[in-house]
């Protein structure tokens, strides 16, 4: 079954239109209100699996930025098969053809709710593309998700002001005891 069939039809009022080679098979989410806020021409693109390969090297640079702050659960190369088979989704922020940011999401079907989890998000010029997050929220709603979740550093709460810290993830490294 195709990835889009699993995700359902888009019912959001957000305009969508395919453009260019990369975007030809991806859904493109553009907000005309936010588009001109910083004088930029940002496009937030949900990249189809078949369009990932041409931009993968740029995406890896962004993933590596986020992974540097993780507990080592995944390396950039570990995302690739999940993105290619549709288990995770790749979003990119493009401004006049430049790839400024990448985000990986995953649909989590909990027993009592469906959630869109942000696995990784990083890039440059965040103050210009972060304002497009409501477009991704709209997509999440259109596929039946009732909330978003993000495992990130505390600093994200300053940026995502309408989010709350629901709980903390506490870890302990046991590798020293393995030898």
Locate each region found by the language model.
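Short, solvent-exposed loop/turn elements at beta->coil junctions and helix N-caps
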Residues: 78-80, 106, 155
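Active-site/acyl-donor-binding loops of N-acyltransferases
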Residues: 2-21, 25-28, 150-179
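Conserved donor-binding loop and adjoining core beta-sheet/short helix segment
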Residues: 84-126
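A residue-level signal for beta-strand positions that form part of recognition/binding surfaces
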Residues: 41, 115, 167
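Short amphipathic alpha-helix that is part of the acyltransferase structural core
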Residues: 14-74
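Active-site rim helix/loop that mediates acceptor-substrate recognition in acyltransferases
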Residues: 69-88
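Acyl-donor binding region in acyl/amide transferases
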Residues: 111-162
